[in-house]
Amino acid sequence: MNWRTRLFFNILVFFVFFLNSMVWAQSARTTAAKPLPSIRVHADGHLLETADGRPFFWLGDTAWELIHNTTREEASYYLHTRGQQGYTIIQTVVLSEFDGITKPSALGLLPLIDNDPRKPNPAYFDRVVEIVDEAAANGLYVALVPIWGDKLTAPWGSGPRLFRNDNLPDARFFAHYLAERLKDRGNVVWILGGDRPARLKGMNNDYLQEMGKSAGFPPNQDWTPIWREVARGIEEGLGRKPLILYHPQGGQESSSLYLHDEPWLSVNGMQSGHGGGHDIPVWEWIARDYAMKPAKPTLDLEPNYEDHPYNPWPDWDPATGYFRDYDVRKQVYRSVFAGACGVTYGHHAVWGFANARNGSINHVDRDWIDAMQRPAGRQMQYLRALVESRPFFERIPDQALIVGDAGKGGQHMQAIRDRDGSYAFVYLPTIDTYFSVDLGKLKGKRIRASWFDPRTGIGTLVDTFDGGIQVQFHTPSYGPDWVLVLDNEAAKYPPPGLSRWGM
């Protein structure tokens, strides 16, 4: 392919992508009035679907303080923008972390009367319902955290500690009240945990034990009974079995390690976080969860935030800098290609809606309005588009596609394909990298190879090869990261990321 042909091909691909994006945006607007179907676990146990059987790719955004820290106009701007940027779900909190009980919201509302979980303030919960409905109008689901974890673990967190093992009915009452207010909304799923472990008992984690000890908890502390009551209250309030996840503290302790067999837990969650350095091997944690029985979907609910300072605890060294868009892409692509049912993006200024009124923590470097247009935040839609442009429910992780060592840390490559061997994706985090792929893992006499740019969402055809052989590839000299897309030519798939396959 000469340079003129390749240039024409790239222009054509970009034009089609632009038109397709406009169609998707218009579709979201025209269907906004329709109730969104609920989400459930797909029959394979690893992925998600809507109640009417359509694929659901979890592309989340952390908006933890949306209910507490935004005006109506700000919330509308946030929801509209994230809807237009291709997100499918936002994560927010009812009883939020930072003074969410004692400080009135941006609308002047407190969630509880006299700090009593048995006395919810109806006006505050009216606002919760409004946000859920406005999210639906923008094509968004809401992953609702009823209770941030510090309301169980304070003074590990600002608290106050409202829910204890000796007042379990309070947790069930509060969850029931909230769920009953939302029982007619299909666009709500539930997240328990709120950045805290469900227990200290049996956790071989010195940091968690030290945090628990400093807050006055014994080493065998177990908050699981409280979360069971929350889950029970949600189910009773809804009148149906809900989709529930668990959001643990940062680190390799996925909810699978201590909650996997809980009947109320639908999806495992983990938090690779912001304090462990670059290139945390989240792909290994996803693979561990993926192999567990019975199968449950899993995902990283809080990777390194864009523009978050690198490990600011206890004191930040500015020389270490911030996590930027490249750091975010490396983590989200590799976790999804390792078998996750999706992934959550986050921006350090957006989760708390940092501005002059709300303040900020941990060296926020910009206002949340500006942060809504940061590179990685806009680029996440390309990951979703890529996944949805090929058969959705058939994808399985397969590192055997990569011949030899897949690399470690910042050089780690991650591969995924479909069960029929009609396509494969390989994420490459570095430029000028030589690597080989076993095309024998795919079916087809001829295999078409393309480079997919995760910064622009544009795919470029490289060449076509005979099937059944090993082929060496070389990543482009600019980037820095790329996705190699391999397709059975006979499948006649569209260019990667351009249109939703079979939807």
Tell where the protein language model's regions lie, with residue ranges.
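Active-site mouth of glycoside hydrolases
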Residues: 34-36, 41-279
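Bacterial N-terminal signal peptides that target proteins for export
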Residues: 1-11
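Short strand-edge motifs at loop-to-beta-strand transitions and within beta-strands
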Residues: 469-471
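Bacterial N-terminal signal peptides
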Residues: 9-21
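Active-site clefts of carbohydrate-active enzymes
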Residues: 251, 265-267, 286-326
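Short hydrophobic alpha-helix segments
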Residues: 59, 463-465
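Boundary at the C-terminal end of the N-terminal hydrophobic targeting segment
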Residues: 23-27, 33
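Aromatic- and carboxylate-lined catalytic core of secreted/periplasmic carbohydrate-active enzymes
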Residues: 31, 54, 294-298, 305-308, ...
